[in-house]
Amino acid sequence: MNLCFDFDGPIIDVSDRYYRAYLESLKGSSINKTQILTKEEFWKLKQNRVTDFEISLFSGLGVNDSKSSAEARKTLSFKAEFLEQDKLFDDVYKTFEYLKSKKITFFIVTLRVQKQLNHAIKQFKLDKYLDDDSFFCINDGHKVINDIQEKHILLVSAMNKFDLTPQDTWIIGDTETDIHSGRLAKYGKVIGISRGIRSKEQLEILKPDYLVNNLAEVISISSGVAN
């Protein structure tokens, strides 16, 4: 069995970064501070696929300002100073150490561009567990048009590079992109994880093979199947 991890959501907690970008996008507006969403309110909306435009409306902005705020967040969310807000989930190192001890092949496939990924690898010292060949991402400067298609290409590239069989590989992701692209690439199992940018309820609609809350549950399920 081989394991493929999406990055943001399963491995990286991006909620602080997205919330900081939300707050930044409201600066200069004349809205009442009491209308600004708490992080919990904001993240619940994000997880349930409420658009950035709608979130701005809920925060008291008018239509035009909401459009500007939503557009600004597309850039703000990926600026270096905001990427610093990212956190590694507590169970990641322990999970990677376990997989290495069991000699289980695992790798990361993400729609981050190379520069953003390199920043995170250095920030969280992930090169202790994975070499450069185990990260698959988007080239700097490349504009992603179709998330599912782009991720599918990366998933197939990983199979080819490692000479792995898709049916023996499981993908762990937190979005519809991960689930649909995993199925398109004919990965053996598709696991939805509910701590990322989609809620448990949203993931249930997609009918993944398994739905988990954390990586410990992934290990438990995979160990049970392997045995």
Model regions: which residues?
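N-terminal helical cap/lid subdomain that shapes the substrate entry/recognition surface
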Residues: M1-D90
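Conserved Rossmann-like nucleotide-cofactor binding loop
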Residues: P10, R17, Q114, T177, ...
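Short phosphate-binding/catalytic loops that engage adenosine nucleotides
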Residues: V63, I104, P208
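Short, acidic loop-to-helix structural element flanking the phosphoryl-transfer center
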Residues: A80-I108, Q114-N118, H152
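Short beta->alpha linker loops
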Residues: K87-D91, R112, D174, R195-R198, ...
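Substrate-recognition "cap/lid" segment bordering the active-site pocket of phosphatases
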Residues: Q114-T169, H180, L184, Q202
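Short acidic-hydrophobic, aromatic-tinged amphipathic segments that line or gate anion-handling sites
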Residues: F136-C137, Y210-N214
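Acidic, Mg2+-coordinating phosphoryl-transfer loop and its flanking beta/alpha structural elements
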Residues: W170-Y210
